[in-house]
Structure formats: C-alpha cells, structure tokens
C-alpha cells in the first residue's frame, strides 16, 4: 500500500508550539465520497469518478479480522477462510465466477484476489468499465463471501487441493528484518501466512468464521465511473441480509518502540549493503486541522533534509553512495529512515559523509535560499492540484482511501486541502523549518544494516562509533520527538534515489 504523487489530501505537520495559534477545527470529510451503514452495521463507501471514465472500477471488501484474532488452536484459520471462499461460487453459477475472476484482475497492475494481515482481510476486484453485469456479480459474490461460505469436509478438501491464491501483508512475513522489528510485539506469534493445521477441524473453522466475519466489522469501498444510486441499492441487496454481531472487538496490533542498539541483518531483499538511520514515534490520528498542520511541517522538514543531503552529495561528486528516505505508519508506530546504500568496504566512510552533513544541518539549518526554493516548489505543485487529482487513477484513489482509514486520517476535499495548504505555506518561515529539523535530528536513531546473504557480517560497533563521534560527541540527551510527526506515504519524498 505504498506510494503516489498526490499522496494525497493528507500531507504534513506543524510544530507543537505553533499549534496554539491554530484553531483546532475538525476536518470535514470530502463530500464526494458517499458513505453509509446498513441496518446490520455493514459500512460502505462509494466514490464516483466521472473524470476517469476509462479507468477500471475498483472494489475492496475489508473485514476487520486477521491472524491476531486466532488462538493457538486456530492458527492458519484467518488465511484459510479466504482461500476457501475463492474456490466457491456462492449463489452464482461456476461459469459466472470463472468469468468474473478472469476479468476482475487488472492485467497491468494485478492484485491478489485476497490479502490477509494481522488485523484485516481484504478482497480485491478490479473490473473493466461499463460492465454493470460484472459489477452486480462482484457484489453478489462478495456478499456470499461475507457470510455464506460453505464449510464442509468436501469444500475444505477441495480448497486444500487447489493452489493458494491468498497473499499476506507484509508479502514476506518471514523476512529477517520484519521478524526483528516484531520482537517484543504480540504480532510475532500470529503469522498471517501460517497454513491451517491438518486434519482441519470443520466445526472450529465454522465457529471462527461466524465469530469474526460479522457485517458490523466490514467495509466495502467502490471507486469508479459508476451510477452511485444504483450501486448503493445493489450494496443493500447483496449485504443487507448478513447476520451476526461482534461479541468482542478484534485485538489492535501494536509494535514495540524501535530497539536502539545497532543491528546487522542478512536478507535476500538487498543486493548491496543498505544502512538505515531509523527512528520511530507513536502515531496520532489526523482528524483536526492543527494535527494536519503539525504533520505538514515535519514532513516538509524531512523533504528539505532529503533534497539538501542529496544535492550536497551531488555537488561533492560523491561516488558509490545512494541516499533515500522512507516514512510510513506501522501498527500505531510512525517510522522514518534515512537509507544509505553503499559497497561494504566504503560503508563506514559513506556513513561519515552523511552523518557530517546531518550534523551540519542540525547546527546551522537550511539557508534562506533553500527554504525559498522549497516553498516555491510546493506552491507550484499546489497550483496543479486539481489537474493532478483529475489524472489520479481509480486504483490509486482507493489505495489512498484505505491508508487513510487504517491510519485514522480524515480525507478532505481538494478545495479544503488547497486552502489549508496555501495558508500553511504562506505562514511558514525558515526558522520554523530549522527548528523542526533540529528536533528531528536530535532524536535517538537506530543503525539497522541490511546485508546480502553470504556477505561477511559487518562490525556494527565500528559504524556506531563513527555515528556517535559525529552526531553525539558530548553524549547529550536526545530531544523528545513530536508524537505525531509522520504519516504513511503522505510525503512527497521519493522512496529511493
């Protein structure tokens, strides 16, 4: 669920001190999104996009259950239920369902038909435009999946004999870095990729399905050039008769704070050494204008830092070094990293180069010229907001919506975004940005080195000593970071360079 250019109508943060000058107005949801709740608690959201008549119609059914709801006897249930559902036709004919799935996956940007994570299960359909018959069949099939999956010895055996089409988030739950990040968290014992134990206990699967697949824990999202009134009526027919109600809420997944000690991790995910200078803070929702402005400010400071370091390396003709920034929200933790890619034999020297530049920015801040150029660039982007929005594909729009829902961020209308953003840019000063930069660069950062498997393990003590010598020569206590200074994929900073 990462990445687009207008990431979108939730982009950055202003400092705590400035918050007192901002009236904490509640952000108003974008009225273009129609939403409602059926009598049984089932929620739906529809965005009609007449400006994108040729785009595919994107449909997502999110169920608030995942591997975290399993006990030890139920391990693998959350993954197996969508696998079971994908082998069934429900109230449709088998030939209809085959045709639906043949056309229900975008050939250019294919998504797995179902994804299971720790706290959600998502069913994904992407339909050709102007195919109301497929849209109706999709809603019917999803309605059957939401409450009418047949769980019998025959259907279970049939599902087990077919290939598993269900993906997980993250895609590789066994990844070395991911397992390290989960240390100290309840998520560690609840792998969404865990296969169901055999022989399968039919009654236990039924009980799990009835307990967690309840309409009051489901949200359907539809984005595309559709007749909203007709779609909403079809949603009522497909999902209105679902039964069940949650007795207990699903557990909320949380990560422990990032461990401060340096670590080297062997992984197949990189081809050369990648050192992440990483920090994280508790994530706070964005429901009021003051929180949005606080976010924008810290986000802009990070972007300024990225471009400053990149340009400095370019001016100095730095060789064998790549720089990138990555910010995201992971289960109630807001996490950022400055990534340094380097050959192993030059890693310590390259860390020294980057650390010296970070220390210089922390001490001196940005120049007025750099600040003015950044604000001018952001103002120019803002002028193109509506054109950018009009070019945003439906699959991007629905992905942004899902991220906003997961991170409790209010999606606001482009008009409100433009006004708030312009006021923010007009009120910003170089002193504000530099104060935020000093704050961010005074935090404790963990050194996390990803190394290709088979490479000799790097001595992390050497890297930590280099870092400490430059960044903490007096071992001064680290400043406390702002609690809500970043939001997943709401940054304009490129992920890698």
Please describe what each predicted stretch is:
Residues 46, 64-71, 81-89, 121-132, ...:
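Second-shell loop/turn segments in exported
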Residues 202-237, 444-446:
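Non-catalytic, conformational "gating/processing" segments within enzyme and secreted inhibitor domains
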Residues 58-126, 172, 187-191, 303-332:
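M16/MPP (pitrilysin/insulinase) zinc-metallopeptidase core fold and M16-derived inactive scaffolds
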Residues 8, 20-47, 227-268, 273-282, ...:
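Proteolytic maturation boundary segments
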Residues 98-208, 277, 352-356, 363-398:
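Acidic/histidine-enriched segments that form metal/cofactor-coordinating
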Residues 1-23:
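Gram-negative bacterial Sec-dependent N-terminal signal peptides
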Residues 291-368:
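Structured mid-domain segments that build the active-site/substrate or prosthetic-cofactor binding neighborhood
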Residues 28-33, 39-42, 52-62, 72-77, ...:
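Extracytoplasmic
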